[in-house]
Amino acid sequence: MAMLSTSVVPEAFSTPGWQIEKKYSTKVLLGNWVEERGKFTKAIDHTPQCIYRKEYVPMPDHRPDFVSRWYSKSKMEGLPYKHLITHHQEPSHRYLISTYDDHYNRHNYNPGLPALRTWNGQKLLWLPEKSDFPLVAPPTNYGLLEQLQQKWLASKTSLKESIYTTSYPRLPVCAMSRREHAIPVPHPRLQPIPRF
């Protein structure tokens, strides 16, 4: 009986020596990994230097080339706003007629444009170009904005109105076809369903 009784060491279960495999992979983030990662500091004596800082040779008498900087900056920015939007120094509210509006609504009516164009052999173009003579007038307006503003600013009769209700108002009864209505009384030729 004395041989079967073994003494249990209490430290045996608390030490991880008896574990054969780890429960999780080393890539799994466990516990307070964010805080632990913040505490980590690499043991180095000096601040790390980048390759540029290591290989940089200072030139004390060097002056920056502002001309090449200006050229590269203007090349990256492209054409300025005034060259893209303004046309012959006209104010912007006078040439709002688009090419689509000119072609379909005004039917290419432009009194300033000559009737016939001539071929310019030096520039290899038909001159004058239509874009050189823009239509100077306010844009074509069919009253859509005013109609929508009148609808938007109208007094609200009820507070709970959806977009569907405001966009599609209810039609009057006279607008509906009478043939689509259900017959209120059964036809005399129809026999009632017998009930047993």
Swiss-Prot record:
Subcellular location: Cytoplasm, Cytoskeleton, Cilium axoneme; Cytoplasm, Cytoskeleton, Flagellum axoneme
Keywords of this entry: Cell projection, Cilium, Cytoplasm, Cytoskeleton, Flagellum
Region feature Mn 2, mapped onto this chain: 97-109
This protein's record includes keyword Cytoplasm: yes
Single Gene Ontology BP annotation: flagellated sperm motility
Main location: cytoplasm
InterPro entries xref list: CFAP107, CFAP68/107
Stretches the record annotates as Mn 1: 47-62
CC annotations in GO: axonemal A tubule inner sheath; axonemal microtubule; sperm flagellum
UniProt xrefs under Pfam families: CFAP107
Function according to Swiss-Prot or TrEMBL: Microtubule inner protein (MIP) part of the dynein-decorated doublet microtubules (DMTs) in cilia axoneme, which is required for motile cilia beating.
Subunit composition and interactions: Microtubule inner protein component of sperm flagellar doublet microtubules.
Name by which UniProt lists this protein: Cilia- and flagella-associated protein 107
